[in-house]
Amino acid sequence: LADMNTWVSVHCAPSSGTATRPTLTIASIKAFFDSQETVPEKMESKDQMGVKKALHPQGFTIDETQTNLLYALLQMRRLETCMQGLRFMDIKRYGIAFTHLLDGENPIYFKTGDLRGALQLPGDVIEAGMEPNPREN
């Protein structure tokens, strides 16, 4: 929580109009994310976008408090690493399903455990006899 407040102090102005920079607490983070709708795993329109996506962590469990803190942390990482291609590792680690809405085309759905998310082994490793990671067609 201290690191998150440090991040806020570096990235947010002390005040803007009548708003002032918040000091994050577990209660304030919980209140904010409890008030947000969870984004459906299969979005149909941009109106359904939001900061709260269902988490399905692979290999570990998280309680409600940890989930709300992770929502906040993931949003901070999303802002911090925008356009750097680093969000995909968080998507895989926390099992976040998402939808790409494309103008004039059918949406692309990426679900938890989607085989398209497995990084393929290098060609020389496959040629040496190791079985490649499975793919969906």
Predicted regions and their residues:
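Acidic/polar-rich alpha-helix caps and helix-coil junctions
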Residues: 1-137
